[in-house]
């Protein structure tokens, strides 16, 4: 593929394999918790052995949700084990919404990222790619683009049918979506009138820990993209919160309406309760080394380390794994639950032969088409004048371009008939999905992902592929959690993924050619992929060099019904074949449903936390105790 200077910059930005040392251009708008919290020995026990009711491994979105819910009962003791600490101690890049997209270009302080790389990827021309995975309280809710939405009714119906449990239908999980939420409407004095979202108040939640709102700044480019989507007949829907995705909407974000900061799980679920609950203990900067089992395959606790000190945390009721789609299967395997042949090769004592652990990995990828535009975008933040103005506006009023993560408007759609030159295998793959499952999420993307520093503004329309059929896996290379897992997502190795992605690039071009954009916003010709990239092979080559993982690893400890050979957990998150061990993160997803997954992550955590409470009160039953696969 012929490469323009812009394409070269885009390639280097979106496929970075290392992380930057820091973020140089941030407004120094810090809110550290202070020594009264960070050094409190009762809330931060250090490397001290302790016995509690529940040990929760992983302090991300799911883990902090589970820990907060379990510790609502003052008679129940909960320990959280998290390898990272408070991101506010390191940088404000996870505080200011306008810096969210910079994580896509590698502006990740190394203290906050695990530094994982994939195996060489055939779908990326054999390259090794960095895989962002948060090492901080809040997990990926401290790194992501902050979008919150639910999924489709049909997707959850498919989930419920495949796990043989109607409690997973959309109607039955709606209360768990809403339970977390504290929705606040827009500030009309800060957000433009022509970007007022339409949202049914009954579709959101109020009074929960997790703040969701619309940013105080609407991107000008997004207002024009909305007009283009209107021109092609994409109808408005209410915030992607009703179980219906097809259509366009302004996107809800996890932002605190009062201070304008990112509302991560650390800020919303943990920080308000950490001082007030004497039954909650945070082991930050502490690595879970392995799950401990007795001779009866009952999880009894976790071996952990802080620095060079190794110690045990004992769980009298359950161990709950919430380390995410990459590290939960890694932890299971180093603990002896996995493929027996691999475990024996690595001299790990086999607790349970479970070869499905780490398999069935799904992920979302994204890619886009870029233009120079005649409106302000986040690319202006490269220059001192606009940057200083943005800093002042955010610090003084939590307004302006830094109050928004950037990608604030999008639409879910299928590829239109004139572009559907798909193979029989692709048609067969799509036929297995519910009718309300869109093929792509097309997003206004007015943020800097390697744009030239030439004084102009640039933007993209990006597609996140909603129908990933490529399947990867997570494995281990040693018996130690200190070593990186084997990460092989196998992106773009499915024929259907390639064909739909190529068609999606062509569909983005159609959107950008709508008169309302061409006449009012776009300046000059397409800069990436570039007008010379036209054939299927040329677009495919562009995709291989420029797609980006959304870092949504899921399904690696898949949920299923009794007798499902691919299932690791039952519909209540209980690990088959062992006792007192549950998983409550994205690794248990039956599949990666349409929509962006943050809302589903919180929902799953809320639901499984409720299941834990119910089982402890009424008895667990036998579903999670199956010992053969």
From Swiss-Prot:
Gene Ontology biological process terms in this record: secondary metabolite biosynthetic process
EC number: 1.1.-.-
Superkingdom of origin organism: Eukaryota
Residues binding FAD, per UniProt: 61-62, 82-83, 144-147, 586, 597-598
Gene3D superfamilies reported in the protein's UniProt record: FAD/NAD(P)-binding domain, Glucose Oxidase, domain 3
Signal peptide coordinates: 1-22
Membrane spanning stretches: none
Homology family: Belongs to the GMC oxidoreductase family.
PANTHER family to which the protein is assigned, alphabetical: DEHYDROGENASE PKFF-RELATED (PTHR11552:SF138), GLUCOSE-METHANOL-CHOLINE GMC OXIDOREDUCTASE (PTHR11552)
Assembly: Homodimer.
UniProt name for this protein: Dehydrogenase pyvF
Source species: Aspergillus violaceofuscus (strain CBS 115571)
Gene expressing this chain: pyvF
